[in-house]
Amino acid sequence: MTYKEIIKNKEINAYLKKGNENLGQLGYTDHSQKHCMQVAHQAGKILKKLGYSEHEIELAQIAGYMHDIGNVINRSHHAEYGALLANELLKETDMTLEDRVTIVPRFCSYCSCKTGRRNDQRGGCMPGDFICT
């Protein structure tokens, strides 16, 4: 599953669209597909500059695009809801288990990690965690 395929996925886009509508009713600013594409683009740009592999960059772009998917359920804890939704949606694709378990935990950590330093230690920031803050 590639980033280009993810941004064309009808189910993912339906969740993002409805989540943005829900947030709009609550007075939040734009969390549309456009916002998600900007996050994905910035994630890719920053990770490329930091010397990450093309594969890691693509995973960060996928996570960046999907990072607000949990807003379809609730703004509060949207990262956790997003991780659960993303895992189920990505199971239905050809994405490997290894890639899925790399992406899904990022949904729960991006809100708290703001350093941008590479730290692959358990519990630390991973590539792209700081992008979505």
Which positions does each model-derived feature cover?
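Divalent metal-dependent catalytic cores for phosphoryl transfer on phosphate-bearing substrates
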Residues: 50-133
